[in-house]
């Protein structure tokens, strides 16, 4: 059988991740348990297995695997906002997010959650399980004291 599509004046798109927006492809406040996991990891704390399992369940619940990294990026941005860290060009403006947690460590912890959870993501940047956007961020420069 042959499929026939009739144009009725509407746009049709099959772009992966097209619906990956807060409230559409993932919750407006994504991954509450992953937030706790990232904060603990970033500060060098011991990973609580139940929190990690809950985080992994929340990631697995995202229906479109193309949305996972976008949702994690959204989570990262809202975590910085909650912690009072300003972003400039989507980069944190401080080197330390909270005592004992450096910006680049937090970014790496968030971007690596798919690998931690053995969750397939199709949009990696050469490293299995690590969100592509990690390579876009550069840690803030330390201001020299003169």
UniProtKB/Swiss-Prot annotation:
* Tissues expressed in: Endosperm.
Q: Where is the signal peptide?
A: 1-14
**Mind telling me which PROSITE patterns this protein's record contains?**
CEREAL_TRYP_AMYL_INH (PS00426)
Q: Which UniProt keywords apply?
A: Allergen, Alpha-amylase inhibitor, Disulfide bond, Glycoprotein, Secreted, Signal
- Where does this protein have coiled-coil stretches? none
UniProt keyword annotation of Glycoprotein present: yes
> From the UniProt record, which GO molecular function terms apply?
alpha-amylase inhibitor activity; serine-type endopeptidase inhibitor activity
Q: How does it assemble?
A: Monomer.
Specify the protein name.
Answer: Alpha-amylase inhibitor BMAI-1
Native species of this protein? Hordeum vulgare (Barley)
